[in-house]
Curated annotation (Swiss-Prot):
Subcellular location, record wording: Cytoplasm
Presence of keyword Ion transport: no
Function comment: May act as a protease inhibitor to modulate the host immune response against tumor cells.
Any matching Pfam family: Serpin
InterPro entries: Serpin_CS (IPR023795), Serpin_dom (IPR023796), Serpin_fam (IPR000215), Serpin_sf (IPR036186), Serpin_sf_1 (IPR042178), Serpin_sf_2 (IPR042185)
Lineage of source species: Eukaryota, Metazoa, Chordata, Craniata, Vertebrata
Protein name per UniProt: Serpin B4
Amino acid sequence: MNSLSEANTKFMFDLFQQFRKSKENNIFYSPISITSALGMVLLGAKDNTAQQISKVLHFDQVTENTTEKAATYHVDRSGNVHHQFQKLLTEFNKSTDAYELKIANKLFGEKTYQFLQEYLDAIKKFYQTSVESTDFANAPEESRKKINSWVESQTNEKIKNLFPDGTIGNDTTLVLVNAIYFKGQWENKFKKENTKEEKFWPNKNTYKSVQMMRQYNSFNFALLEDVQAKVLEIPYKGKDLSMIVLLPNEIDGLQKLEEKLTAEKLMEWTSLQNMRETCVDLHLPRFKMEESYDLKDTLRTMGMVNIFNGDADLSGMTWSHGLSVSKVLHKAFVEVTEEGVEAAAATAVVVVELSSPSTNEEFCCNHPFLFFIRQNKTNSILFYGRFSSP
């Protein structure tokens, strides 16, 4: 394995397996946002602390000696994980008329800690960000509000109150914040007049009413006979990004699919070689999800222990002793409509829809399914989710 996108996908699945243990219903998060924030900590970490971060994020498989390079700032060599992040974030944050995509990271550090200039220069270069000097010791509540306000501004006010009351104390020293915002319109929009109330079955015994969008069109599609499921790619305008949907054949088939799913299988199933353009009768519910995660215990369970306690070696960040990561909170929001994802009321693009083609396949998302949003050029998964309860 040599690419950051592959490492990100592997970490995404490790995280998903942890979330599955405690969350039976909806799941939604941004793996690339979390890894980029932790990458900034890795840039200032050394020895065991750096090795633990690298191993959990699968960065140790991206290039050799990543941790050593990170600690000494010798990170210009092409292929190095931080260098790859620099290219990736530049690619993501390019302005385009087709969609809005913005990834923003920030570290908020207790102002009594003096951060090294080399570190500040490096995170600016590779992660397009800075350390914000923050008075946690004397003004924890004001600090909390300041962080929340920054997150709101970076996510078009979709993510509010990332840090609830009481989550920032005067013993806080370092807070990682990652924010990602995406708004895209479908390449082929759903016609609103085709949206009807239909049943969605969370399980075989109960159903809930949803607004089910529908369109007949040509999509990249594949049957996954070995796991009794099918996969469909729904492109966004410009086709730089897509939503990929994994749908079990049976109403209660999601658990079996999740158990068999791996990063390697996902990449294989959704490759251009495996999928073919097919006429599909697509039924997709209109939905909105907002999910929050406190990742500290999850990351510790996965093996990232030192950064959260007195053993943290963040001497590449500061000469001061006692610095450790206090919080890693993550919140993600998605809204899927006829227009697209988190679509604004912009001028409509007229799309010529196929006039009732002879449908080869039906893809009816009326029971729990998995979905993810992918940047196709870099094969990077921006968001990953499970929709199982409207």
